[in-house]
Swiss-Prot record:
Cofactor(s) the record lists: a divalent metal cation
Native organism taxonomy: Archaea, Methanobacteriati, Methanobacteriota, Methanomada group, Methanococci
Role this protein plays: Catalyzes the transfer of the AMP portion of ATP to flavin mononucleotide (FMN) to produce flavin adenine dinucleotide (FAD) coenzyme.
Organism: Methanococcus aeolicus (strain ATCC BAA-1280 / DSM 17508 / OCM 812 / Nankai-3)
Pfam family of the protein (one): CTP_transf_like
Protein name per its UniProtKB record: FAD synthase
Length: 156
């Protein structure tokens, strides 16, 4: 998927992107600022269920569609159900941006894995965005539960 134009810098980031919040947007803006083209890999529903123990609230195709509609994003694709490295190996990005809560990849291990496969990719880890009340999906869910459900079930 890498273009023949050696001057075009491709940036890739990945995530669940369930219940969009300003932290997601901040990560996407930052990722886009590092290159010319931003491609976002959306975690599959089944992958999220395996990792987090629950399916996302928003189905994968809707999450992909919403992310692709956000201004900094040039393209959004669904991840692989079988190999987390598959989209990276297809796209061959120059830079991979890992969000602050990225648990699928460790920056150093990912860089080493890709190097063994012949890809020299810069890995950047973003810091948590805390400039607003609802900077994570968990914060949004907590607020919904607080407003709409029995307040006793919320643990701080």
């Amino acid at each position: 998927m890498k273009t023949n134009d050696k001057t075009k810098k491709i940036v890739l980031t990945a995530g669940t992107f369930d219940l969009l919040h300003p932290g997601h947007h901040n990560t996407l803006k930052y990722a886009k600022s590092l290159g010319d083209e931003l491609i976002v890999v959306i975690a599959r529903d089944e992958t999220v269920k395996k990792i987090k123990g629950r399916k996302p609230v928003i189905p994968e195709n809707q999450r992909r569609e919403m992310i692709e509609a956000i201004k900094p994003v040039d393209k959004a694709i669904l991840g692989s159900l079988t190999d987390k490295l598959e989209p990276i190996l297809k796209i061959k990005p120059d830079i991979i941006v890992l969000g602050p809560d990225q648990i699928t990849f460790d920056a150093e291990n990912l860089k080493n894995e890709l190097k063994k496969l012949g890809l020299d990719v810069e890995i950047v880890k973003t810091k948590e965005y805390t400039n607003c009340d609802f900077h994570s999906s968990y914060d949004i869910i907590k607020e919904i539960v607080k407003r709409w459900c029995n307040k006793k079930i919320i643990k701080k």
